[in-house]
Amino acid sequence: MQLIDSHTHIYGEEFDEDRDEMLARATEAGVGQMVLPNVDVASYPRVLELCAAHPERLFPTIGLHPTYVKEDYISQLDYMERELSQRPHVAIGEIGLDYYWDTTHQREQIEAFERQLHWAAKLDIPVILHIREAFADAFETLRRVNLPQLRGVFHSFTGTREELEEALSFPSFYVGINGVVTFKNSTLKEHVASIPLERLLLETDAPYLAPVPKRGKRNEPAFLPHTASFVASCYELTDDTLITKTSENARRLFALPKY
């Protein structure tokens, strides 16, 4: 079973010089399909172009990342809502709340988050959630919108044990784990194995957060086996067992075709 990178930004300019080689390295490393979340209107055409070139391997999502919620957020959302009807997307994302860098637009972030959650519910596709320093508001928003059919993933999860327990209280949501779990100062390794295996996804979030022993380098999908191996050790499982299960999970959540 090949690995599925459930969250990667390989359409970014960081890969413009060696994108084909990077994809070849991913293949060699056993990484097959990948989900490509966009972050704003400007990034969306790049996502579409790359996915169109590899339609059985790369899959687009659409959404407004919380740190891109600025004064023009309504016009960005209007554009994305129009695009939703033009082609299929495997998810709405990445969306959510991020109070780490800037708290100027908290109200607008919540409004954008709610609107996009309703898109996903209406279209019956999952959401990819980016939550940073904002779990209380995110959980409150998810409960307030009260959309029973909503499903998705808490991407790049780095929260506390208590936040993990609350995330898992949403029964149709998975938890995405990336290279952060391998970092020496990460406490995530202490409780990652409490995530039920049937609700675990693996991701790179490339070009960010390269796992040990590649930390400090530009991250890429070929590095995903390092994270997989580390997480497998936390569960006391073989790499193959963990890879098989997480790939099945990703294929089920995003309705990916066999590859």
What do these predicted regions represent?
Residues 1-259:
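Mid-domain alpha/beta scaffold segments of enzyme catalytic cores
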